[in-house]
Amino acid sequence: MKQSMVFSPTLREVPADAEIKSHQLLLRAGFMRQNASGIYSFLPFGLKVLHKVERIVREEMERAGAVELLMPAMQAAELWQESGRWYSYGSELMRMKDRNAREFALGATHEEVITDLVRDEIKSYKKLPLTLYQIQTKFRDEQRPRFGLLRGREFLMKDAYSFHATQESLDEVYDRLYKAYSNIFARCGLNFRAVIADSGAMGGKDTHEFMVLSDVGEDTIAYSDTSDYAANIEMAPVVATYTKSDEAEMALEKVATPDQKAIEEVSAFLNIEADKCIKSMVFKVDEKLVVVLVRGDHEVNDVKVKNVYGASVVELASHEEVKELLNCEVGSLGPIGVTGDIEIIADHAVASIVNGCSGANEEGFHYVNVNPERDFKVSQYTDLRFIQEGDQSPDGNGTILFARGIEVGHVFKLGTRYSEAMNATFLDENGKTQPLIMGCYGIGVSRTVAAIAEQFNDENGLVWPKAVAPFHVHVIPVNMKSDAQREMGENIYNSLQEKGYEVLLDDRAERAGVKFADADLFGLPVRVTVGKKADEGIVEVKVRATGESEEVKVEELQTYIANILK
C-alpha cells in the first residue's frame, strides 16, 4: 500500500482527554478517531490490526471445534425478561422501543438469543455437544467511558456458547477453549495471566478471566510468588489463621471521639492499633440489610458477601438507610446494640479480637474493650475480606503479590442457569427431558487491540508485534525527487509484496524527519530506509522493537528481512 493513498491522519500533540498510552498513540497514529464518548471509528491502519486479531481468534476457535454464526444486535425484551435479566442486568443495558412501543435491547451479550435459537433446534443428546461463536458489535451504556477502547460503549467482541448433555462434556470443551484463549493471546504477543474470577451478572460457577498485565488495568490480580496460582482479587480466598490473645477481657466502655470517623483517625485518637478495631458496614443484599464486620486493617469484599447469600445484587446501604436502621451516621457504626432481625456476619479475623474498639452507633462516640460474642452476637463467621499482599497463597505455596490487569477474555461454566430459566431442554439417551448444560466464552476483540498497544509502545510511538502489525515492512525513500531512491523504493516495495509481505511505501513528498517520526509512530516491525547510498545498492534496515539498524545490500534484503520476521 502506498502511503500517499492512505487515510492516516496523524497528530503531533497528545489529545487532552486521552489518559493512557494506548489511547494517546492510537489517536496520534491515526488508527482511530472518537465519534462520541466511548464510541470510535477504526481508520484503515487500525482496522487492519483489528482484522488480524479477528483472524487469529477465528483460527483458534475453529481449531477448537467452534462454528461461526452471526446473531442480531437488537434483541427482544421478552427474551431478557424470560431469563430474568431484563431488570437485574442494570443500567448498562441499552434499551429502546420501536414505533409500536415494543421493547428491545442493544446486545450487551447474547446468552438469551443463542439459548432461544438452540432450544428450537436441538432436541436430542445425539446433536450434542455443540459450540457456536460470533464476532459481533456489543453495546453497554458505561457510566464513565474512559481509556479509549478499554472501556467504551460500543465494542467488538467474540462470544462463544457451548451446549452439552453432561457436565463431563462441558468440562472437556471448557478446557479446550481455555487452551484456545491462551493460544490467541500468546499469538498476539501479549504478556497475560489466566486467573480465577467471579461470574457476576452472567451466572454460573467455574470461571476464569484472561488478564493482560498492565499498570493501567482496572482489575487487581492476586498471584503467588512461587506457584502458578492467580486470581482476581475479588475471588482470592483468605486462608490465614488467627490466634486469640490470652489477655483478660476488660469492661466495655463508651468514650467520646469527636470528629473521628475513619479507622485511621479513631485508632490514632484512642492509641489503638487498627487490627484491634472492628470496621462495621451495612450492605443491602437483595433488599435485605446486613451488618458486615471486618478487622480495621482489612477491607470488605462485597463479592464474598454476595456469595455468602447467593445474592443477585449487593450494594452498600445508603446514608439514609443506615440512619433509619441504626439512628446514626456511617462513621459511628458498630455491632453493639443491633437488634431485631438485622443479621450480623463477620470475617474470621474479627473472632480473634480481644478488647478492641468499634463504633457506638452514636455520633461522636466509640466503644473500647469490645469483645465479640460477649458484647454482640455474630450469626456467621466466614471469609469476607480482600486478600492482601503478604498473605499466604490460597494453594499453600508462597505468598501473595499484586499486579494490575486488563481483562481481555472471560470463560464461564454457565451450567443450566439460562436453559432452566428459558426451558431449553433435550431428550437424553434414556428418553428423559433434561435442561441443556451451557458454557460461555468471550473475548474483547477491540479491547485486545488496545491492550496490545498498551504493552507494546515506547516514547516514540507504537511497536506492533509482527502477528498483528498493519504491515510487516515500512519502505521509506528519503528523497522522492531522487530517481535512484524513488525507483529503488518502488522495486523493494514490489519485490517484498511478491514474496507475501505486507508493505507500506512512504511515497509522500515530505521531509525525512516527518517520514521517520510517522514511521516510529506507526510502529511497523521493520523499516527499510532508501537514502544516499541507493546508488551503491545499499539500504538501512531498522528493527522497530529493538532500535537496531544495519546497512544491507539490496540483493540480500529479502533474506535479511526473512530472518527478522521468521
Swiss-Prot record:
The gene is proS. The keyword NADP does not apply. Catalyzes the attachment of proline to tRNA(Pro) in a two-step reaction: proline is first activated by ATP to form Pro-AMP and then transferred to the acceptor end of tRNA(Pro). As ProRS can inadvertently accommodate and process non-cognate amino acids such as alanine and cysteine, to avoid such errors it has two additional distinct editing activities against alanine. One activity is designated as 'pretransfer' editing and involves the tRNA(Pro)-independent hydrolysis of activated Ala-AMP. This is Proline--tRNA ligase. It comes from Bacillus cereus (strain G9842). Belongs to the class-II aminoacyl-tRNA synthetase family. ProS type 1 subfamily. The keyword Transmembrane does not apply. Its main location: cytoplasm. InterPro entries: aa-tRNA-synt_IIb, aa-tRNA-synth_II, aa-tRNA-synth_II/BPL/LPL, Anticodon-bd, Anticodon-bd_dom_sf, Pro-tRNA-ligase_IIa, Pro-tRNA-synth_IIa_bac-type, Pro-tRNA-Synthase_IIa_type1. GO terms for cellular component: cytosol. GO terms for biological process: prolyl-tRNA aminoacylation.
